[in-house]
Amino acid sequence: MAAKDQLEVQVMAAQEMELAGKDPVSHEHEERKPVTETKEGDVTDEHGERGSFAETDEHTGVDTKELEDIAADIKEHLAAKRKRIEKIAKACSEIKNRIKNVLRTTQLKRQKRDYRISLKLPNVLEEFITDEQKDEEGDGEKEEQIKIFQEQQKRWQQDGKGTERD
């Protein structure tokens, strides 16, 4: 955990250096403690426990094994996120394809319906026109019948007046 804290401090210091316009890498070498010769048995960590020289960074005293573990955890976490993102992207594309298919199907149904209606429309219009013509003819026949009836009434009235005189 101490190595993680130390790593965070180093990262924050590097970010501050970048903001200040300094090169964090070259500045890092300036801040390091001078290297002293040590033997494998002389290396101890912060808690006084001895570790092998190969597992410890000679400049900072950070346990490289711990850093490698942290890096491995980060890689696992990123791989898991990448898989989740890929799954989400795949699901989105599937949903997008479904929506396209539904829209295409709906559009085809609408076009078929409109086509069938357009085929029926001339027949319906023709029926309407013939019905209107029949109604007009029927109106003309009714008018003729009314005229004939009125003429007959006049004759009857005239006949009735003429018979009364007799």
UniProtKB/Swiss-Prot annotation:
InterPro entries named in the record: XLR/SYCP3 (IPR051443), XLR/SYCP3/FAM9_dom (IPR006888)
Principal location class: nucleus
Subcellular location, record wording: Nucleus
Tissue expression profile of the protein: Expressed exclusively in testis.
Any single GO CC term annotated in Swiss-Prot or TrEMBL for this entry: synaptonemal complex
Ranges where the record places region Disordered: 17-63, 129-166
Keywords (A to Z) from UniProt: Nucleus
An annotated GO BP: meiotic cell cycle
Tree of life domain: Eukaryota
Compositionally biased tracts (Basic and acidic residues): 19-63, 152-166
Compositional bias of kind Acidic residues: 129-142
Family statement drawn from the similarity comment of this UniProt entry: Belongs to the XLR/SYCP3 family.
PANTHER family: PROTEIN FAM9C, XLR/SCP3/FAM9
Protein name per its UniProtKB record: Protein FAM9C
Protein source organism: Homo sapiens
